[in-house]
């Protein structure tokens, strides 16, 4: 964190008394420059801080005793003084005997010490300024202790009453009593855009919040001082604080969040923060921004604390106000700030901190979430919320929708009247009922959620509702969030509800509430919960409190000792009850007491007389003209209460679905439960849907019957005499057709309705269920169409078809003849009575009650007698194969394949047969054959790798035809060349895209590009790694020039004079040097015939390496390169330098890549032997300093990009790239420095170019964390702002070439690393995944690279010349 934003505050033992609270101390910290006068450098400091310059803009506040003038200043006669009065007197903390005197006692006292708060005005200034500066804000005075000019404002404690707000107070001047006043040196408003005060008026800013505003100032000294430079007369000022109830938006959480209290002047006008309004009264106000809980007051705190409410001012005489001690604590760690301790403060914040650690780690709490009062949903970011005042109370509640508001009002409405108390089914308490459950045609009343959950668990009921917010889950798949609590599965609508349920369930208050509920239930009915009760299942005596309740078959609650006992008893009872008889009305399994025979021959059973009476009443209501009609067997299911019924249903059409209900009550409850809300057509309010009526073919929704009637009146008034009611579809519409039938004129909405009505009237219309013609008694409106049915039976069948289509009920015109015949016969039998169902009459039989025939099933068990008897086919039933060798070709007669005949089956078995082959040889070489054989045997090496390679080479040698050679020695020497040609000719897959390099024996890279500083002494050389060498800064060197054109490779030797002229030229990268060096090394090994002197050379020659690099396998190339880096010599026989060997290996790698060879000799695990040998050689490299001060090396950065050693195409290449950039730009040239690097210390930063004003991203790293204790060796490789600042290393974004941008590489590295490692402070370089591919989302593991691997990487990076050029460039730039 930038230190410029941190202020300090030094506290004394009187600080709590002076400040009154933390808010008073902190709210004055950022005060100053609010009025248009120039900033005054008026800072009072202790003697040790005098004559010290302040370069930053920190808010530094010191509190110390200041000797006031000997006499108090008189008041101006024409000014109105206003004093700041607290509601309670404050007491000194501890054993301090000083008591705050009253204002009357303060007036005559002189010579005492007063406390002064000096606040920095947030401007860069010198404390020893001595020139006079005019101040228009406050009266100046010069204390004797300091030379600085200090402005003081008096907040004196005096007698103040509501009736004397506008009256002047004669004794409100500066007092001389200790601890009696707070004096402010300079005041600055917290708003940057506040206009200045002129002519005694303060202009409030529009749309902005100001934490402190001062509109009128009265002089604290005598009138001889005169007015300010801007014409504003200095005046006394004070505070008139009024309590204000915050708005609903600010009341999100008690005591948390910003709150701007209202501002009121003396005249009573209220101003909110940010509103623009003139001040009509010269008496002004001060408003302080703080957080206040709504309708709450914190006990014991009456100061202007940001966490306490503003109490109403009770103005009492100061002699009755005791002083109250207040502690100032750290806002982060809550530790009290001691006397003399330095406090830190952030600009614009009222919080104090004990240290910079607490200041940086402190963060404001997030804005609290707003929840819907009804469903508890998070509505913090939801738009369109509803704020309503419920139950005529002063509090406002916030809801997510109108449905929640309606449900909340319905929930609160029973509380207005008398409580409907009933006895709970579970606990038996006579209390208010919260739940009613209809189960098995009985309503069970439950008093609480606990009893409701126990009821659900006992009866196995599952509710599709969220356990937290109660939201309806339409299906089981909707509640995928399941939480198992105490063996029970609780379903939730979303993961946030699961989290809230866990937090509420784990809260101690929740657990205490459950325990208190259980304890209260036990205490209220001890005789019930303490007695022993017999379990219904196992008949065991248990306490009633531990019993599990369940509804039995008789509809009453039965106790069980456990859930297992309850389930076993239900299973047993279900088996015995399966043969029982079900009551036709209440559907209970009980012994029938009454039977009724219907006219159609059906017999119904009833359990008691009440069921018979209810059944008769229901049947008579549905019978036309009082005639009894037998109820139908078709049962509909109510969509709300889930009960079965056989009467005409109530229909609700909503969202292209038709819902059926058994009654109007269920329909209304369903609408409320599922929030079926729409805009009423009449009142234009969003309310629960009552009914939808068609008007002129358009559906109009209404919220009540009254709105529907009123809309009908308005509709009829608009149409006048043309408004009619259609006799067919019953809608109110404009007259469309008229028809006279039997002398009655009927009106219709259209010709179609008129035609359909005539068909119905003349009985020509068909039933929409059974498709039969005749009298259609029932009609309903289904999906906007009128449906007619024969009777209620067809109506119920039609509704069943809509729920579960049954093809047997779909009768088409093909049954017309049968239907007419049935109809005719029924008409003759019953006369004018309506025809019953077309189902045939059922055969009637007598039934005996309580008589059950005893039946027994007798079966004959026939067991066959088994006997085993051998036969011909039983023996040797498995086929046995016998090999019979038969020479081929030969004819083998095969008999006919019978079931008992074995036949031979030919099988081919290859057998190797040694065949001697004789090769001709010249007569002159026959004597050398034994010696050659012995020589070949001696070539066998003890090294397993050499033996394997020798075997492979011998196999290739046999294919090349060594017998055609003139002698054995020439065969051994020329085998490599012949094998290379054969391999290139026989393998068409390996096609070189790069031209072959001709062999040049005198080509030498160190001659073509010599080191220009070889004549320098060894003292100019230094050992690597040079960790921040200070010797570079002590001797400034000229800036390195731009690299010139690259010179071409030439043959032969050149003198050092010629090479020194071109020492600054960059070396061209040509792979021909590496390939030519390989060929030179292979030919040298082949021509060396002294095999007995060098054992290692003899073993290598047995591998028979070839000049063509592409003809070797990975193992051969690994072995050859390992020996190549150790044995390669210049054409003159001298050793190559380590950087030259690295250059040659890079050329070999480029040749392999250009020839479509995917091997990477520096990264692949197959070249581990070569990498170890190369690292040993590179460790001995010691760079030399050229005369121009640059470092000499033949390896450059561009070479590594060309051969893909750097880049983001693979995990290892990306890791090498980051390692190279950190070494180049951060100056990390030791392994210890790289190990100090971590994800937490490298961060992205935006840097602005002061010339082009262009922002560029960069990676920043602090030198102090990098160097540790190596301060004496550090150099500023990063840019510094000041010499005394710590240097900062940066890797600036490369916009010219994004593929080589350090910032892009770092972002790619973060994206391919595990996410949980981004802020770790102990790791930066991660181990690559062994099985990861380039398409994998994660390339690295959470394990850091070992030290050995980092050392090998550092050895290669330090040979690159560009890392030293980068250092020299930045050094020269800093010296400019």
From Swiss-Prot:
GO terms for biological process: negative regulation of DNA-templated transcription. The modification Phosphothreonine is found at residue 1375. Low but widespread expression is detected in the developing kidney. There is a cross-link at residues 48, 88, 98, 104, 147, 253, 297, 312, 324, 347, 365, 416, 440, 490, 502, 512, 528, 531, 575, 602, 648, 657, 687, 699, 708, 763, 787, 811, 828 (Glycyl lysine isopeptide (Lys-Gly) (interchain with G-Cter in SUMO2)). It is found in: Nucleus. Involved in the negative regulation of transcription. This is Zinc finger MYM-type protein 2. It comes from Mus musculus. The lineage of its organism: Eukaryota, Metazoa, Chordata, Craniata, Vertebrata.
